[in-house]
Amino acid sequence: MESQQLSQHSPNSHGSACASVTSKEVHTNQDPLDVSASKTEECEKASTKANSQQTTTPASSAVPENPHHASPQPASVPPPQNGPYPQQCMMTQNQANPSGWSFYGHPSMIPYTPYQMSPMYFPPGPQSQFPQYPSSVGTPLSTPSPESGNTFTDSSSADSDMTSTKKYVRPPPMLTSPNDFPNWVKTYIKFLQNSNLGGIIPTVNGKPVRQITDDELTFLYNTFQIFAPSQFLPTWVKDILSVDYTDIMKILSKSIEKMQSDTQEANDIVTLANLQYNGSTPADAFETKVTNIIDRLNNNGIHINNKVACQLIMRGLSGEYKFLRYTRHRHLNMTVAELFLDIHAIYEEQQGSRNSKPNYRRNPSDEKNDSRSYTNTTKPKVIARNPQKTNNSKSKTARAHNVSTSNNSPSTDNDSISKSTTEPIQLNNKHDLHLGQKLTESTVNHTNHSDDELPGHLLLDSGASRTLIRSAHHIHSASSNPDINVVDAQKRNIPINAIGDLQFHFQDNTKTSIKVLHTPNIAYDLLSLNELAAVDITACFTKNVLERSDGTVLAPIVKYGDFYWVSKKYLLPSNISVPTINNVHTSESTRKYPYPFIHRMLAHANAQTIRYSLKNNTITYFNESDVDWSSAIDYQCPDCLIGKSTKHRHIKGSRLKYQNSYEPFQYLHTDIFGPVHNLPNSAPSYFISFTDETTKFRWVYPLHDRREDSILDVFTTILAFIKNQFQASVLVIQMDRGSEYTNRTLHKFLEKNGITPCYTTTADSRAHGVAERLNRTLLDDCRTQLQCSGLPNHLWFSAIEFSTIVRNSLASPKSKKSARQHAGLAGLDISTLLPFGQPVIVNDHNPNSKIHPRGIPGYALHPSRNSYGYIIYLPSLKKTVDTTNYVILQGKESRLDQFNYDALTFDEDLNRLTASYHSFIASNEIQESNDLNIESDHDFQSDIELHPEQPRNVLSKAVSPTDSTPPSTHTEDSKRVSKTNIRAPREVDPNISESNILPSKKRSSTPQISNIESTGSGGMHKLNVPLLAPMSQSNTHESSHASKSKDFRHSDSYSENETNHTNVPISSTGGTNNKTVPQISDQETEKRIIHRSPSIDASPPENNSSHNIVPIKTPTTVSEQNTEESIIADLPLPDLPPESPTEFPDPFKELPPINSRQTNSSLGGIGDSNAYTTINSKKRSLEDNETEIKVSRDTWNTKNMRSLEPPRSKKRIHLIAAVKAVKSIKPIRTTLRYDEAITYNKDIKEKEKYIEAYHKEVNQLLKMKTWDTDEYYDRKEIDPKRVINSMFIFNKKRDGTHKARFVARGDIQHPDTYDSGMQSNTVHHYALMTSLSLALDNNYYITQLDISSAYLYADIKEELYIRPPPHLGMNDKLIRLKKSLYGLKQSGANWYETIKSYLIQQCGMEEVRGWSCVFKNSQVTICLFVDDMVLFSKNLNSNKRIIEKLKMQYDTKIINLGESDEEIQYDILGLEIKYQRGKYMKLGMENSLTEKIPKLNVPLNPKGRKLSAPGQPGLYIDQDELEIDEDEYKEKVHEMQKLIGLASYVGYKFRFDLLYYINTLAQHILFPSRQVLDMTYELIQFMWDTRDKQLIWHKNKPTEPDNKLVAISDASYGNQPYYKSQIGNIYLLNGKVIGGKSTKASLTCTSTTEAEIHAISESVPLLNNLSYLIQELNKKPIIKGLLTDSRSTISIIKSTNEEKFRNRFFGTKAMRLRDEVSGNNLYVYYIETKKNIADVMTKPLPIKTFKLLTNKWIH
């Protein structure tokens, strides 16, 4: 039975179509209608409401649509007669009996004609005493009089009922819903009572007081039909009427029984909630009363657990018992029995008879045998409810996860078995077994099920009433063939093999058990939360644990998919042997193929299509009779439900009829689908499909882009294929009006080939239904195949091609043939087909050695189009091959991820299909095939560049048993490697370069040499061979820990390209015991660095210790160490993978090191990442290829740029001007003029909206008294310099509203008309970011306000005049300004002074010194940006008080109050912010960039590729003089200003990772060469590809006592023109990036150390200013830190030696930095170069390094 909570119980829940009815024990002395006074009033109110709508006209009466029904009349007016009988609603006392009315004696034998069966027919009897309806038929029922009452009439005869007849009786209301039937029955019974028929109403024992007469039965039948239409009757009522349509008495009897049951339950609940006990009655009586109530509620499906029961009992205790409420309330595991023991003890003390009464304390063994979930009796007992159950009662069913259980045993045992659905029970029949009993004979079906959705776990289900499991190996004390049925949600029976106990052993070493049913016919193993609750175990989904009521955690819960799971490792296995299996074994020759297997084999087609195909032999090898179709009707494929989910179906039959007259392949439909995002460069982003109108044959072709030449190539291919293969000529091609089809190139091609293009007409979407439906179908199939197989998304077109092959072979239910048959081709041999994603092993014909494994794991995709082979995807080689040398992989290790009917489920069926094809590993194979691993030239995915999700075998091989890593780790790793190598990779890195496609034909046995990365000084380290040293114990531990990082699974790949090899020890995951290099401890290394004299002329080499952060000075106190750890702890630094061991061959030892010279490059120019190249390996380094970002565009520069030093002798006039005028960046114009928006606007709707906005702005100007309307001035009389030109500007906001603004032309305003000393201040972006960060950490409410027409609130002091608005028509007149109009030079300053004064004087705020437009008081912080305000406070009421004060003076509009606890979205100063208070904040600009970037006219997504980094290292800007004319030069400069303007706006808002590229390109705005434009296009393209990226903040730990402000600094020495250095700084508050800066050093530095000192000195002033702001806004202490990767810089800062400063400038700079660090309490620490996220601010980085440094804080 379903567990119900006390507060969720509804007395009207009976009678639903899905629930059975259980008859319950009913007291005969209680009126079933007398539930409660409140319910009676509610019922009558409902009937009044229902009838009040039917009182006015005849059309609103009870049955208005019947032509025989007339409106009721008063008694004095005779009713109209439309036939031989009176109207059914005009029942009078003295109606005459019509002739022929007398029927047979028994009511059930009344002969009804079809007309008489109508609800409108009512033939009264000769002496009928039925009352007449009043004139207001259908009006609400009046309150019953005392004589009619709310009880049944217990008259002894019919005559007594007839004596007190009322003249008028109101009819019952009409039944309008099955759910209202219980309430309607109550009013109907009252209607019968008022009609003197109370004696025929069944009493509580089911029998009426007297026998019903024929007249009364007819009256009962007709009135029931009139007021209870059949369409609104519940299912159980319809079932009774289907047996006997006149058996209204049975319906009334059952309704009364239900009402009585509900009344008893309600009374019990009320009684239990209002218990009172003070010892005045015996404790025995009180205990009996309470336990009886609880037992009744539990038996009726209302489960009262111990905790609730004890709380209700204790709440009613008073007197001397009241102290139990305070002594027991903390006892969480208290039971009802224990509570009553204390009550008995107090009662015995009160009576003074403790020794004379028996002791009520029971033995623990008695409590264990109690049948309830709590113990409150002295002996176990079985509660049997309703011992007098009638024959027509049904047992209550209990629901599980889509299943429910009911009992089929005799009625005497029914209750005990039903009770077991929610709690442990005491069984009574011979099959009952207690826990611990031995099993003598059993037929439990032990079935191994290891293919759950989440293997090895149980599905937690709150709706399940019973626990069901498929494997019998965990069932204890099992008994076979129990008399219990399992019913799913569709009421289908599922057989149960056995019942037993499921025993748990949890983390706290506690054991418990619940009842479990065994069946192999369910999708998942279900664990009922109701049964766990019965043993005091609950599921906490906030903490994801199973716990007891006292909070003890028992086991974790796993969230997988949409469900929650708990591991089976907590189950105790049974020690019984596997019993006899009940299933009948079917021989191999007669067993049929299961339908789910065929469904998946044939691309998840529907059953009807597959049957048609088998009948018509379009699918060969087996017949329709070979498939088991029993489950086809009810089978639901989860992959189809997920992959093919749709909104609605396309409209069929929408094509024109004339198309049917064409011959095959003369009329084609075509359409393009795409793009598909986040794919590797080699994978297509689009596909184009063709469908023949006559044969319905389909073709699909992949596309990387939608350019004209790409589309033309496909058209050429398809036309040639049809002409040569089918000897047909295409006459017409139907397509939509996309630009890829309407371009001139394709039009000329079709015209040249004599093909008519048929375009869809405007708004005729139905005409293109063939191509659109095909694309939708193929896309559904693609999603389903990928979902089912678990293959990565970049193989999506392989799924499309597989589906096309199958779809062409399936018969159409309409034509009874397949497309292949229509085309004259043979049917598809299904034995040549494999399920998409089937695991296989491919033969490796060219291994490294004879002992190398010959098999490569792969996944079958689709049959080859160019050979007899199969296209197979090989994750380890990152490619697809076309081969016939493969074998199907079977067994557990080949299992895919998603569902339990994947390849493993049908291994035997698959073997039967492919039996005729021998594997290359078969024992009888003699000759080896010659077509080994034929690479498919046709396939676009023949070569896939991927990072497969599988660790390499070299890791497990490198670990020796003597390593310090625990042995368990080796075992787990080896298992994981073997298992992962045969699993489909779930995800793939979409940003892998296209150049690394083919692996080498012969894998080299020589490993690659890791590249050497430059140090902070830009110099290179020489390689001392051998490099490897044995790991110390600490290093081994750290490597082992790092190897477990989930973010970096390819540690060997990273170390080959990103590791710095020096002469210091290198930690290795492999634990190589190389004894040729002496071991150097971390302490000794650190000691050498500390005591070494700092070198000024040349930077010291970087230490590459395995420590993440190494302090440069020896800590003197523990507090300083804690400070360092505290500063570093929350920073979003990358997690470095462990460095793998690298072995170098002997020939390499003889090679001299390769040195790379420095170059002067605008974008880095230092080829340090390629200092060492791969030796003896033809395979190119993936990291080298990732840095070669190539974007295909006809006008883009395709020349291979090399790192060459540019000549310095050439003059660069434009470049010099650009450097001096970097700030001349023009914003993008997004507004319209008056003539563009209104005068010449051809869009009528938009024009009307702009006109409306125009008038709204004019009215606002007049309302604010912007100008003097009393006098107009002549233009000739006013000094021209005091006349300000004005204009209207219009724009459309992102929310869709149209805005108009009247502005002054301040750009041409005369200087004498304003005070140049006034400042128009706005909030600094760093102040806003700081306030947002503090708001997140302190759970502040954020409120956003807007002050309408803010400038107009500020008066203007100067005498200025403007022209009137255009609509006034006074072009020769002037008006004098009184308010600060938008656009004036002084308007901003005037408004700032106005609002500042009001906030300080009226709102009690004060402005933070040094930070303009930041106001604060003790509760609220305000950031002001012109007319936008952002309020921050701990208490939302504080914000509201400020708002109220602002509204008193200004028109203040609340944009976002910020009161919700869920995620709130803001648009603050261009930043799109998602904020959930106390959890996270995300800052981005996706919507803004999506709108603005396309308006720049930059070609986006050329060739469908996505950039992985904004630039590439190793290039410099060729700065030759420009040879272009003046007009073209201005046009390009203007274009650069727009592009760099947008990039700067975005970069300084939140995309700090782009600042280096923005700063570098901004220096070349006035030098718009083709290369500069190409690099700018590349930057905009990257911004477009990553427009969805966000700056991610998470709330700081609440335990942090201090605010931590950190600046991370970096410098690239001499990498800018004229050997200038690039410096960069990133600022973080409590681990959140709040700002960044990248700029070229103002002076030329002579060393790396000097550049680093310059970078740090640039960061200190802003760091101090931010520190002051933070202390003003938040009173917590603040810790300031500086992080740099230059040890020599730190040494100079810490040292007191001034002798080695090379010059005065360098010395003064260093000394000043020393003073700033010491005077401002700054902590300076060292950070590894690989972890220095400020590195992205100073130079272009390889893709992998760029991602590594940024993916922690922006993604």
UniProtKB/Swiss-Prot annotation:
Active site: 461
Residue ranges of every copy of the RNase H Ty1/copia-type domain listed in the record: 1610-1752
Annotated spans, Disordered: 1-93, 126-173, 352-421, 956-1087, 1092-1111, 1130-1187
Compositional bias ranges of the Basic and acidic residues kind: 1038-1053
Annotated Mg(2+) 1 binding sites: 671, 736
PTM comment text: Initially, virus-like particles (VLPs) are composed of the structural unprocessed proteins Gag and Gag-Pol, and also contain the host initiator methionine tRNA (tRNA(i)-Met) which serves as a primer for minus-strand DNA synthesis, and a dimer of genomic Ty RNA. Processing of the polyproteins occurs within the particle and proceeds by an ordered pathway, called maturation. First, the protease (PR) is released by autocatalytic cleavage of the Gag-Pol polyprotein yielding capsid protein p45 and a Pol-p154 precursor protein.
Motif (Bipartite nuclear localization signal): 1178-1212
Sites bearing Phosphoserine, chain numbering: 416
GO biological process: DNA integration; DNA recombination; proteolysis; transposition; viral translational frameshifting
Residue span of region RNA-binding: 299-401
Keywords associated with the record: Aspartyl protease, ATP-binding, Cytoplasm, DNA integration, DNA recombination, DNA-binding, DNA-directed DNA polymerase, Endonuclease, Hydrolase, Magnesium, Metal-binding, Multifunctional enzyme, Nuclease, Nucleotide-binding, Nucleotidyltransferase, Nucleus, Phosphoprotein, Protease, RNA-binding, RNA-directed DNA polymerase, Transferase, Transposable element, Transposition, Viral release from host cell, Virion maturation, Zinc, Zinc-finger
Comp. bias regions, Low complexity: 153-165, 402-418, 960-969
Keyword Magnesium assigned: yes
UniProt effect for mutating residue 1178 to G: Partially prevents nuclear localization of integrase and reduces transposition efficiency by 30%. Prevents nuclear localization of integrase and reduces transposition efficiency by 99.6%. Prevents nuclear localization of integrase
Catalytic activity, reaction form: DNA(n) + a 2'-deoxyribonucleoside 5'-triphosphate = DNA(n+1) + diphosphate; Endonucleolytic cleavage to 5'-phosphomonoester
Protein residues bound to Mg(2+) 3: 1610, 1652, 1685
Region feature Integrase-type zinc finger-like, mapped onto this chain: 583-640
A Pfam family assignment: RVT_2
Domain of life: Eukaryota
Note: Retrotransposons are mobile genetic entities that are able to replicate via an RNA intermediate and a reverse transcription step. In contrast to retroviruses, retrotransposons are non-infectious, lack an envelope and remain intracellular. Ty1 retrotransposons belong to the copia elements (pseudoviridae).
Comment, domains: The C-terminal RNA-binding region of CA is sufficient for all its nucleocapsid-like chaperone activities.
UniProt-recorded name of the protein: Transposon TyH3 Gag-Pol polyprotein
Organism in which the protein naturally occurs: Saccharomyces cerevisiae (Baker's yeast)
